[in-house]
């Protein structure tokens, strides 16, 4: 399986990489949060742009991105607008969503974008090609905050992302039972062993799914999300605890 290298970080080799999400409403808070995050132990900074209030002003959005880049120049920056339909803070039209991601790509300030699988096949394919032409990696994602589908469906979605040339396919699902967590882990393992030719990220959410955030190296998930301050999704644990557990499992 090929790895994905962003800056000096090799995703898909060794212990799962830790991603943290920064969620700030304006430029002042972006700056203060970035300064607070700078001291934390993590690998990738995700900027959750759907929390940013002034999305109509692209210059303001990119000014905030510039602050993040300058505050943590060594950290890979993942630009994510999580749509309301997949658990994000704001609804957005497909046209505006694509335009925002293209602006981020054009800025030269971001290393990766998050692109939701169910945005529309043509738009997704075109945006992936546009990102790659500008040396920006694509994390292609799908989130279900209500349920966990069957393993076959989980694998089908991840394979579809791979067929669309995502650099890193990602899926996050809500378990209704402990067996749902096992379904996610089994699907991850099957994808990893039989179909994946690139790193994947999977997780089962909420307290029930916490084990999936820790056991990525065992089952085949290349990264996991931790919290510096406020968790961006149910079930996230602190980056300090997360690094400790990931290191223990890696060295065992």
Curated annotation (Swiss-Prot):
Could you tell me what reaction this enzyme catalyses?
3-dehydroquinate = 3-dehydroshikimate + H2O
Binding locations of 3-dehydroquinate: 21, 46-48, 82, 213, 232, 236
Q: What is its EC number?
A: 4.2.1.10
Q: Which UniProt keywords apply?
A: Amino-acid biosynthesis, Aromatic amino acid biosynthesis, Lyase, Schiff base
Q: Name one GO biological process term.
A: chorismate biosynthetic process
* PROSITE patterns reported in the protein's UniProt record: DEHYDROQUINASE_I
Task: Report if keyword Electron transport is assigned.
Answer: no
Q: Which cysteines are joined by disulfide bonds?
A: none
The record ties this protein, via Pfam families, to: DHquinase_I (PF01487)
Q: Pathway it acts in?
A: Metabolic intermediate biosynthesis; chorismate biosynthesis; chorismate from D-erythrose 4-phosphate and phosphoenolpyruvate: step 3/7
Query: What SUPFAM superfamilies does UniProt report for this protein, alphabetically?
Result: Aldolase
The active site consists of: 143 (proton donor/acceptor), 170 (schiff-base intermediate with substrate)
- What Gene Ontology molecular-function terms does this entry list? 3-dehydroquinate dehydratase activity
Q: Does the keyword Lipid metabolism belong to this entry?
A: no
Q: Supply the PANTHER family for this chain.
A: 3-DEHYDROQUINATE DEHYDRATASE
The entry's family comment says: Belongs to the type-I 3-dehydroquinase family.
Briefly state the protein's biological role: Involved in the third step of the chorismate pathway, which leads to the biosynthesis of aromatic amino acids. Catalyzes the cis-dehydration of 3-dehydroquinate (DHQ) and introduces the first double bond of the aromatic ring to yield 3-dehydroshikimate.
By its UniProt entry, which NCBIfam families does this protein fall under? Answer: aroD
- Share what the entry says about its subunit structure, partners included: Homodimer.
Name it.
Answer: 3-dehydroquinate dehydratase
Q: By which gene is this protein encoded?
A: aroD
């Amino acid at each position: 399986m090929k790895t994905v290298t962003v800056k000096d970080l090799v995703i898909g080799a060794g212990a799962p990489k830790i991603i943290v999400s920064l969620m700030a409403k304006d430029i002042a808070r972006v700056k203060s949060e970035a300064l607070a995050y700078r001291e934390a132990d993590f690998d990738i900074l995700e900027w959750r742009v759907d929390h940013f209030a002034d999305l109509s002003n692209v210059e303001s959005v990119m000014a905030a991105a510039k602050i993040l880049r300058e505050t943590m120049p060594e950290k890979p920056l993942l630009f994510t607008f999580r749509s309301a339909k997949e658990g994000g803070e704001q609804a957005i039209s497909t046209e505006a969503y694509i335009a925002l991601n293209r602006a981020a790509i054009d800025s030269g300030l971001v290393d990766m974008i998050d692109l939701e699988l169910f945005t529309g096949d043509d738009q997704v394919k075109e945006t992936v090609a546009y990102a790659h032409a500008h040396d920006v990696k694509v994390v292609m994602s799908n989130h279900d905050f209500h349920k966990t589908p069957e393993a076959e469906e989980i694998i089908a979605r991840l394979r579809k992302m791979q067929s669309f040339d995502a650099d890193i396919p990602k899926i996050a699902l809500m378990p209704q039972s402990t067996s749902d967590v096992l379904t996610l882990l089994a699907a991850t393992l099957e994808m990893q062993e039989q179909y994946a030719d690139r790193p994947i990220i999977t997780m089962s959410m909420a307290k029930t799914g916490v084990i999936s955030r820790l056991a990525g190296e065992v089952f085949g998930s290349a990264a996991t999300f931790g919290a510096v301050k406020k968790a961006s999704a149910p079930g996230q644990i602190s980056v300090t605890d997360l690094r400790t557990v990931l290191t223990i499992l890696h060295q065992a």
